[in-house]
């Protein structure tokens, strides 16, 4: 995704809703915890903070979230790590929620996120590194890119997808309900 780098002031963005996401890693891949804000009216996604490290056990992840001051926030964690999410709850992160994933959810999440202008705090160096290196798989026969991201340089991006997943599902339902209202009124959308 295209993005703009700048120093972001959390206080100036405090009127926008916050979203938190966690992608687990360990030895080869880092764990990534991100804080983002969404401005739906202006179609902007702000990436405010990241905590990205390798070799983190769940107790260290919980302590980092507490140290950042987000232990009481709703955090969306990778549902492939239900056991880790439960352990974080036991370690004092009570509002971590398993992200609902299904067929096509990665592409759906990316497509939603691409509708927004990304503004990344320049201190989020790992997120910036991923955005610079994120790429798509190529068809072996045609050498054309296909709608399937390469599974590298994606941990921060996955955490952003998780953080915003429920927001976009809620938006989808609101838009769907609006269309249903128009249909019922005879507008035939």
Language model: regions and residue ranges:
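Coil-to-beta-strand transition motifs
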Residues: 26-30, 42-43
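ATPase catalytic-site recognition across NTP-hydrolyzing enzymes
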Residues: 1-25
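Short beta-strand scaffold segments in enzyme catalytic cores
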Residues: 31-37, 161
């Amino acid at each position: 995704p295209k993005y703009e780098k700048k120093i972001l002031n959390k206080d100036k963005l405090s009127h926008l809703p916050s979203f938190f996401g966690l992608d687990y890693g360990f030895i080869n891949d880092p764990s990534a915890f991100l804080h983002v804000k969404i401005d739906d009216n202006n179609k902007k996604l702000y990436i405010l903070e990241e905590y990205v490290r390798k070799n983190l056990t769940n107790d260290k992840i919980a302590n980092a979230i507490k140290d950042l001051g987000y232990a009481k926030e709703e955090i969306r964690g990778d549902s492939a790590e239900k056991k880790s999410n439960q352990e974080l709850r036991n370690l004092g992160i009570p509002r971590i929620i398993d992200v609902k994933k299904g067929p096509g959810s990665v592409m759906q999440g990316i497509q939603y996120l691409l509708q927004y202008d990304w503004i990344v705090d320049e201190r989020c160096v790992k997120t910036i590194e991923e955005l610079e290196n994120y790429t798509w798989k190529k068809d072996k026969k045609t050498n054309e890119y296909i709608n399937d991201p390469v599974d590298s340089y994606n941990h921060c991006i996955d955490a952003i997808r998780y953080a915003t997943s429920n927001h976009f599902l809620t938006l989808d339902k609101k838009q769907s309900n609006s269309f249903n209202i128009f249909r019922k009124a005879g507008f035939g959308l």
